[in-house]
Amino acid sequence: MFATAAPAPRAARSTTPPSSARASARASSSGADVLYFCYGSNLNPSTFDGVRGMRPTSSTPCVLRGFELAFNVPGVPYVEPAFASAVAREGAECHGVAHGITRDEWEYLVTTEGSYDVVDVDCDAYDGRKLRCKTLTHRTLKNFGERAPSLRYATLLREGARFHGLDEAWIARLDALETYEPVELDLGQRAALALSVGPTLLAAVPAAGAAAAKRLSTGDGRGAVIDAFVETQDVVWGVQNAFFAPWMGSSGRNAKK
């Protein structure tokens, strides 16, 4: 289940995250390494090492077959509409990097990534090795589908792919991604969005509660949290589609579309 990487000595690189909160969450390292296949912003060392405080012992370029890069993870309307996921799709492939990290780092990563599901996958390293990895995938929500990422987010993927020397055709694909073109919201529109937060979250309570209760009945506490969050996201974007998109434009889908 957990693949063992060939770690370099770790003494020179502390896994202590910058904040005390992270330190308490990851107080000790078990020494057991996990190969984590990443394809999104965690390709970029400014995010993975800098923001998340991870210290990978190895980073191996590879391809995951049978999965496709998709921007189906809901973000913040009109600001950061969509994030990346690897979605199972026959005949597709997704390029990325297998990071060797400790079990504690992996558990911290999963906890902080929100509503992703964990799956075990087999990756083909560029050097010919077969790697058993763990990766994160996200369900496609009916009210969200897939949308364009922000330029900021797409740039993280592009820079990360170049940093790790990913396939040139893959980099060209990332360079060709359409990015979300933000719309200028007036003061009234901004106020309406802000005032809608509370009622929208209240409207999501029944669906989120039912989803959480169903998963809790199986004893899966983390799954219950994820299911509740996913249902909340779907309601939020349902409100966005029904009420705000006709007035302010569809966040994550440019006007020309």
Go through each PLM region and give its residues.
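Glycine-aromatic micro-motifs
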Residues: 13-20, 24, 28-257
